[in-house]
Amino acid sequence: MTGKTRIWFNRGFSLAPIAGLMRAADHTLDVFVSVSHQSAHYNGPTETWIDGGDLEPDDKDGYLQWVREMIAVHEIDIFIPTRRRALVASASLPCRVHLPASIPTLEILDDKFLFAAEFAGEEHHLPTHLAQGSDDLERLLDGWPTSEGEPGPCVKPRNGVNGLGFWRLMDVSPLAHLQDSERRRIRPEQYLSAVRGQELRGPIDDIVVMPYLPGPEISFDILATHVKMLKYAARTKLGTGRQHIVSRHPLEDLVASIVAKFSLHGVVNAHFRRAEDGRCMLLEINARPAGGVVYADQV
């Protein structure tokens, strides 16, 4: 035994630098992070390893056995899962398991359509529509407002993280999505054609469609204990690539109410973006630390 408290986060690439901050702040901690096969491994002081080892992705029993082995080998005291949470919560493990919310709540937070529905009728609610296939998507796009000043549509996977699968549907060059893919712009008929093509190969994941928000983004890094927000930092992402970070923000009361609504616990992140009319619309709650929390710590 090392005499230190040993904490393990699973499958969180951005958590490795966060873990380094934790160790620097408290020398009684050892922090480990398991990452995906595609992620880079960090050289100490935080140890990283492949999450799940060589197991097949759908081997649930094998994954739990691997987790038990890692807990034993590394003498883990606290396991903080950021993936496969329902599976982990259902198992009996030889250490403490920390979750940022109940499993039913996490299922809502991970579902962009259900999450948006939780705030229907409220000022910061972002209207979010569900497309379960190309026919749904075509109907939504055909009925989308086209008058001047109306925001165009954007699409995302119903369940997804890190902005994967986000596209703005716009009247752009047919090559725009190939020549400048980082701007995430594609013609609506090209996106719809791609969805139809994918359907010929098999079932597709649900898509959500919502108005595009010009921004800027405002990201709240939150420390909470169940229903109470203890501390936060708000990061406004500027167009220059820099961030403006404050510890007091006009949205503070709203964010505190969201923490209470979902009984959030630990370090989580609330993500807003400004609409054309200046309102801050709630995009999502990430029930895990955001990578940008390291910037807030520096100030």
Residue positions per predicted region:
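Catalytic phosphate/metal-binding cores of nucleic-acid and nucleotide-processing enzymes, i.e., regions
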Residues: 270
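Glycine-rich phosphate/pyrophosphate-binding beta-alpha loops
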Residues: 163, 236-243, 286-298
